[in-house]
């Protein structure tokens, strides 16, 4: 933690200098806007313009370290849930058809992500989700509705011996996974960014924990 001495500028204005390392990291320059928000405990939170904090890092996934295509798919889902926007999947040799098909299948089940570049040895996935367009309560409600319908369809298919209804329930399961992974991504992003948490409707950090529990039980179909 760094300390700064409060200086008086003019008749009544108080000022505090910003840490140089932080201003360089955030690429702050003269004339830029910074935003102050008061926390519930009285602390002040300083943030830069929303566009400046965009994560442009490329996260690497080495296929050679994945035992099979299922593990590869799980790794991609994990990176998506953690809020990563650009994921490069690569191998020291030509990607196998099974691996490519696994990547394509999993990206079809993840909202807002797609393949933007491809070669024999790598694929680049990019997620273009704007968290502010997904209010948390709306996403949670959607997950609840899907799982409720899926449960009813499953029970009715067993009672009536209706195979078509059973197939509908399986389709709902895939849709529930998609919404659950989106919800998990939003909550992970909210933990990392106050701007995201405010954008999706979280006012108290404890809400993140509560919604994580709700999401887990809402998608638990054991």
Where in the sequence are the language-model features?
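Cytosolic, long alpha-helical scaffolding segments
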Residues: 2-6, 11-13, 17-222
